[in-house]
């Protein structure tokens, strides 16, 4: 069992997942530096690099983003149906400079490097992840037995329908879909398809470099991605965000709403539960070990180095 703490401020949101009194996960989002992962843009091919089998894509940001041929969806190459590892069609035969593409960010920019992109779009819902360019039904391995997964897959295939009948598309069932009714799954399917239809409609009406779809905020992703049956409580120290999250959860994650609590204490929520101290210890350059030795961790743009020192360890 675990608890989730949300510390909200106008400039920054921090989320800590606490299990057995220790911080197991820490998530941070700055208002002016929101992550781009999951965002969908209408991009324009700025340059094709055959030697690197990649292309630079202008998505309206300061630096051009990067698209590798392996992340380029095409009807002629499907990695899931490619057991022989047949190489994909060369990128210079698939895209050209000036071409517009609907792309999704899969990795945020770092240092001087632009964002990493994919044209294989995925849209996360409450119980499902929609893969509009695919026809695969995937089931989380965390869901029950093989028999339960097979039953869910059969139900989903019926609900999804056939492309020629207006259905189709690929879906991955998240862990919270295990106990979902057909009505709940059907509602999520309809919501995700509607979202994709709106994205496609915007892509036809907007110029290249336009943001077509933005992923949920960190506070909302707590309910979608972090809250599970193992969550005992979700405490948030902002009344405004508590009310907004409750309204959001009532529609998309009703089972998690009952676990929401507004923290009203005078002490900062992260201080009260010892999170600040754990953060400082985790981010320290030096990490002391029980044996008497210690680690020195340094991060550069290219790599992270870990220097192991014996210190007071004498065997």
Predicted regions, residues:
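DE-rich acidic low-complexity regions and acidic surface loops
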Residues: 1-315
């Amino acid at each position: 069992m675990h608890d989730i703490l949300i510390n909200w401020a106008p400039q920054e949101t921090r989320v800590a997942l606490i299990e057995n009194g220790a911080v197991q996960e820490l998530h941070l989002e700055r208002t002016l530096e929101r992550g781009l992962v999951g965002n969908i843009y209408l991009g324009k091919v700025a340059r094709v690099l055959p030697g690197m089998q990649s292309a630079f894509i202008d998505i309206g940001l300061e630096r051009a983003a990067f698209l590798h041929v392996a992340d380029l969806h095409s009807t002629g190459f499907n990695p899931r149906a490619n057991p022989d590892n047949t190489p994909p069609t060369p990128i210079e035969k698939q895209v050209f400079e000036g071409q517009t593409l609907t792309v999704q960010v899969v990795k945020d920019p770092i240092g001087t490097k632009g964002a990493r992109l994919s044209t294989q779009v995925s849209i996360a819902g409450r119980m499902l992840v929609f893969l509009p360019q695919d026809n695969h039904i995937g089931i989380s391995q965390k869901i029950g037995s093989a028999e339960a997964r097979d039953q869910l897959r059969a139900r989903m295939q019926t609900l999804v329908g056939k492309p020629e009948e207006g259905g189709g598309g690929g879906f991955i069932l998240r862990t919270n879909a295990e106990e979902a009714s057909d009505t709940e799954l059907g509602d999520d399917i309809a919501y995700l398809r509607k979202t994709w239809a709106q994205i496609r409609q915007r892509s036809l009406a907007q110029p290249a470099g336009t943001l077509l779809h933005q992923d949920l905020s960190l506070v909302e992703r707590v309910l979608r991605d972090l809250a599970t049956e193992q969550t005992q409580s979700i405490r948030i120290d902002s009344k405004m965000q508590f009310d907004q999250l409750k309204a959001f959860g009532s529609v998309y994650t009703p089972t998690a709403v009952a676990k929401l609590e507004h923290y009203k204490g005078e002490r900062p929520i992260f201080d009260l539960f010892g999170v600040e101290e754990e953060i400082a210890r985790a981010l320290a350059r030096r990490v002391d070990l029980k044996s008497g030795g210690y680690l020195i961790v340094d991060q550069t743009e290219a790599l992270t180095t870990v220097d192991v020192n014996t210190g007071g360890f004498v065997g």
